[in-house]
């Protein structure tokens, strides 16, 4: 119950109330804001000097040496060794040559916090062994897979499917035993380098360059595996809807708000395929701005129906964490469940559908309802 209003009997008090003035407004703010220190930066990785790539890589094969630098630095050096010309591309993209040290080193009165030299006085100039090269291949294969899929979680978890890609590559290079024995860097997981590269503004251009360059062997065999992973990577909505339209046998397809978006989806994807040709499957991996045209928000009802169907039919989607009903959708899960009880016909005569819905269904091979 709200408190009772107190009656004011005192005439002076009533007069004071009439004379009440609101407090003055706050003074205007000057518009200044906390500034970053001029010339300051967070600890960052580096790639050293181009002439030192091989010697730096040899040194960084040793864990104790890797531990001296920013955790991403060794991975970037291994990539520069793997792909000649990448060092210059990284420099063009703004990657520093100097790497921060994990712990500053004091020499006399000077404290060193970063350096572009990653090898020590005891590091010898030598060629890498085949097993060392294969170990660098393994590390970089996992790293680049994480970059094209836009996530480090599978690599951090050591997913078996990632290991299979490397084993397939080693078999193609006639070194099948290295699929099991190239383990010199197995304790150095590249997940931090994946996250760092995925956060750079040039990541899409980097992936595009990898996918469109004709590499000599063993680069060709290496990139064949990366391309297989990159194809339709980060395009889950598109691939799920395509599978739904091709394989669904229930009447959720005929819900009007879903059906009308099928037509839109087919038109948009056809236009994107025409515009991008062979690059269409890689729009997600190269972070092309057109990839957003295939996002759930473009077809919220169709995407909701497709995810609902896929979670019921596809075991690999059962653990998909995204919400079934997408933002902006008007279709409800109860409605999808009700329509799912009825089957459609593909290639056989079935019950008639309304004119406009029927025309849309014919686009995907649906001939009626059972």
UniProtKB/Swiss-Prot annotation:
Q: Where is the composition biased (Acidic residues)?
A: 10-19
Instruction: Tell whether Mitochondrion is among the UniProt keywords.
Output: no
Region feature Disordered, mapped onto this chain: 1-25
Q: Alphabetically, which GO biological process terms does the record hold? A: symbiont entry into host cell; symbiont-mediated arrest of host cell cycle during G2/M transition; symbiont-mediated suppression of host NF-kappaB cascade; viral penetration into host nucleus
Motif (Nuclear export signal) on chain = 128-141
Keywords assigned by UniProt?
A: Capsid protein, Helical capsid protein, Host cytoplasm, Host G2/M cell cycle arrest by virus, Host nucleus, Host-virus interaction, Inhibition of host NF-kappa-B by virus, Modulation of host cell cycle by virus, Viral nucleoprotein, Viral penetration into host nucleus, Virion, Virus entry into host cell
Q: From the Swiss-Prot or TrEMBL record, state where the protein is found.
A: Virion; Host nucleus; Host cytoplasm
Instruction: Give the InterPro entries listed for this entry.
Output: P40_nucleoprot_BD-vir, P40_nucleoprot_sf_BD-vir, P40_nucleoprot_sub1_BD-vir, P40_nucleoprot_sub2_BD-vir
Q: Which GO terms describe its cellular component?
A: helical viral capsid; host cell; host cell cytoplasm; host cell nucleus; viral nucleocapsid
Q: Which Pfam families match?
A: BDV_P40
Q: Which domain of life is it from?
A: Viruses
For this chain the motif Nuclear localization signal maps to 3-11
**Gene3D superfamilies of this UniProt entry?**
borna disease virus nucleoprotein, domain 1 (1.10.3040.10), borna disease virus nucleoprotein, domain 2 (1.10.3050.10)
Assembly: Homomultimerizes to form the nucleocapsid. Binds to viral genomic RNA. Interacts with phosphoprotein P. Interacts with host CDK1; this interaction delays host cell cycle in late G2. Interacts with host NFKB1.
Report the function annotation for this chain. Encapsidates the genome, protecting it from nucleases. The encapsidated genomic RNA is termed the NC and serves as template for transcription and replication. Plays a critical role in the nucleocytoplasmic transport of viral RNP by interaction with other viral proteins. The nuclear export signal is masked by the interaction with the phosphoprotein P. Delays the host cell cycle progression by interacting with the host CDK1-cyclin B1 phase in late G2. Inhibits host NF-kappaB activation.
Additional notes on this entry: Isoform P38 does not have the nuclear localization signal, nonetheless it is localized in the nucleus.
The molecule here is called Nucleoprotein
